[in-house]
């Protein structure tokens, strides 16, 4: 799938933009501050920020509410999501249609670029080249995801047996050929910038008579910020079904998945409070890399 066209899985899986906006979580002040510090944007007045694949504006809202007074261009190709974002009329935010490989910005416009909850959809050399074009020299590209444990990569350890079971249920859907954060292949686009191991010293590579050099620094920086949240089983289900691979389930497949979900959430290892809410664990995953 070209990064200059809307991925079919995203177009269908996120068709209900209002539900996505209602049930997807925002970003904590702790995670946001750490993230912006890594991007060298924290406390920088009026910095120009590209919010790429802004969706319904979960991250855009957080950025617009901060004290820096960022000048934000929020780029989103999904018409329904972009409409939800435009309704919010956020201060300092200009909303534009566009794709990762064809950004509606001039060269070296941005002091920093942010991709929240979406980089796995367009982790391609073409997208990196275009992001590199619009960033100022040495500016930082940051990618961020809220990852509940049901959506984590399988090599990450779960906090509880029931969350591990829910994670296994999500993985039982198998691969539909669509890119997912939990498959953890999005990092390859950075590591594969060179034909040799990116952790070794950069070597010359003969490529059409020139040097093939990386566009962004490697290895990427990484940090996890843990979080917990109490949710009713219904709210947990509503959040879970905002995942595109679950949102597209229909008929018997949807019913069978929901039955398995209900059985897991009714399990003995689930911690509940007096309101009947269950305790859900997750991390906000941060990664960043500098434009070279």
Regions found by a protein language model. Name each.
Residues 10-27:
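Class I SAM-dependent methyltransferase Rossmann-like catalytic core
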Residues 126-137:
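A short glycine-rich, Lys/Arg-flanked "PGG" loop and its adjoining helix->strand segment in the class I
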Residues 137-229:
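Conserved catalytic/acceptor-binding region of the Class I
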Residues 101-112:
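A short acidic, Gly/Pro-enriched loop at the edge of an enzyme's catalytic core
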Residues 111-125:
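A short SAM/SAH-binding and catalytic strip from SAM-dependent methyltransferases
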Residues 193-292:
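Conserved Class I S-adenosyl-L-methionine
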Residues 25-46:
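Conserved alpha-helix/loop element of class I SAM-dependent methyltransferases that forms part
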Residues 48-102:
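Class I SAM-dependent methyltransferase SAM/SAH-binding core
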């Amino acid at each position: 799938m070209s990064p200059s066209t809307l991925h079919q899985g995203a177009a269908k899986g996120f068709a209900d933009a209002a539900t996505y906006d209602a049930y997807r979580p925002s970003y904590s002040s702790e995670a946001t501050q750490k993230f912006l510090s890594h991007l060298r944007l924290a406390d920088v007045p009026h910095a120009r920020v590209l919010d790429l694949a802004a969706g319904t504006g979960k991250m855009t809202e957080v950025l617009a509410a901060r004290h820096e007074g960022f000048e934000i261009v929020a780029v989103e190709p999904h018409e329904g999501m972009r409409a939800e974002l435009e309704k919010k009329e956020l201060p300092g935010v200009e909303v534009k249609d566009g794709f990762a490989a064809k950004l509606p910005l001039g060269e070296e416009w941005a002091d920093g670029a942010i991709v929240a909850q979406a980089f796995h959809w367009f982790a391609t050399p073409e997208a990196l080249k275009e992001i590199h074009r619009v960033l100022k020299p040495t500016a930082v590209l940051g990618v961020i995801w809220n990852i509940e444990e049901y959506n984590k990569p399988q090599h990450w350890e779960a906090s509880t047996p029931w969350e591990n079971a829910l994670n296994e249920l999500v993985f039982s859907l198998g691969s539909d050929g669509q890119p997912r954060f939990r498959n953890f292949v999005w990092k390859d686009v950075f590591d594969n910038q060179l034909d040799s191991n990116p952790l070794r010293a950069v070597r010359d590579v003969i490529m059409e008579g020139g040097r093939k050099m990386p566009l962004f620094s490697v290895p990427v920086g990484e940090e996890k910020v843990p979080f917990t949240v109490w949710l009713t089983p219904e709210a947990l289900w509503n959040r879970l079904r905002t995942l595109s691979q679950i949102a597209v389930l229909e008929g018997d497949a949807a019913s069978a998945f929901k039955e398995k979900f209900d059985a897991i959430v009714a399990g003995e290892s689930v911690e509940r409070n007096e309101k009947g809410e269950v305790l859900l664990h997750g991390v906000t995953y941060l990664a960043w890399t500098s434009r070279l």
